């Protein structure tokens, strides 16, 4: 049975890029599978197939045809089918399930995944942690992404971290940037602790 990790967050927060980075960091040690969700295309899956050194059959794109969080929370049948297909064919250690870009209320059904990560980015605004969406409050790990952009959008990362800590209570969170690859080690450590 695979460890299934959901990854949700608003459009453009860096979900696909996170999966790309994590796959590159984990693929030599673990067997991986990826399921992506888009409303009318398989754009994210196609991107990952082009950029990753991973068998294309290990990446499945789901076209939800509607509201992104419905496919990961309410009617999970298309995603479950994709996960089962990966498990039967490859028996992966880890399957990443990426939701389509959504608002702050995205949550996963725990019938689909074991744990989920919620991704926000600093360019979305300093007030995002204070808006207390379900993804931000209840995800198993919150990632504040694109910290390298903070100076350009006039975000004080210290203040943002205070807001995140206050709203997350005792739940884990990390601040990362693809431009600072060592920050991704925190996410890798979190995942490896679950295996």
From Swiss-Prot:
One of its GO terms (cellular component) is cytoplasm. Its main location: cytoplasm. It is found in: Cytoplasm. One of its GO terms (molecular function) is nickel cation binding. The keyword Nucleotide-binding applies. Keywords: Chaperone, Cytoplasm, GTP-binding, Nickel insertion, Nucleotide-binding. InterPro entries: CobW/HypB/UreG_nucleotide-bd, P-loop_NTPase, UreG. GTP binds at residues 9-16. It comes from the Bacteria. One of its GO terms (biological process) is urea catabolic process. Gene3D superfamilies: P-loop containing nucleotide triphosphate hydrolases (3.40.50.300). Facilitates the functional incorporation of the urease nickel metallocenter. This process requires GTP hydrolysis, probably effectuated by UreG. Belongs to the SIMIBI class G3E GTPase family. UreG subfamily. Homodimer. UreD, UreF and UreG form a complex that acts as a GTP-hydrolysis-dependent molecular chaperone, activating the urease apoprotein by helping to assemble the nickel containing metallocenter of UreC. The UreE protein probably delivers the nickel. This is Urease accessory protein UreG. It comes from Aliarcobacter butzleri (strain RM4018).
């Amino acid at each position: 049975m695979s460890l299934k990790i959901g990854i949700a967050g608003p459009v453009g927060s860096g979900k696909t890029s996170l999966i790309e980075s994590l796959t590159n960091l984990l693929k030599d040690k673990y067997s991986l599978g990826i399921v992506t969700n888009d409303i009318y295309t398989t754009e994210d899956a196609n991107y990952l197939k082009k950029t990753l050194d991973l068998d294309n059959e290990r990446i499945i794109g789901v076209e939800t045809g509607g509201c992104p969080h419905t496919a990961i929370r309410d009617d999970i049948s298309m995603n479950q089918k994709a996960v089962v297909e990966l498990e039967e064919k490859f028996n992966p250690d880890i399957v990443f399930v990426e939701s389509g870009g959504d608002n702050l209320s995205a949550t996963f059904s725990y019938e689909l995944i074991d744990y989920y990560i919620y991704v926000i980015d600093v360019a979305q605004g300093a007030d995002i942690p204070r808006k207390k969406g379900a993804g931000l409050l209840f995800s198993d790990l919150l990632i504040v992404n694109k910290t390298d952009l903070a100076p350009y959008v006039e975000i004080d990362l210290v203040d943002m971290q205070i807001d995140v800590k206050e709203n997350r209570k005792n739940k884990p969170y990390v601040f990362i940037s693809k431009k600072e690859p060592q920050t991704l080690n925190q996410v890798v450590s979190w995942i490896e602790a679950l295996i």
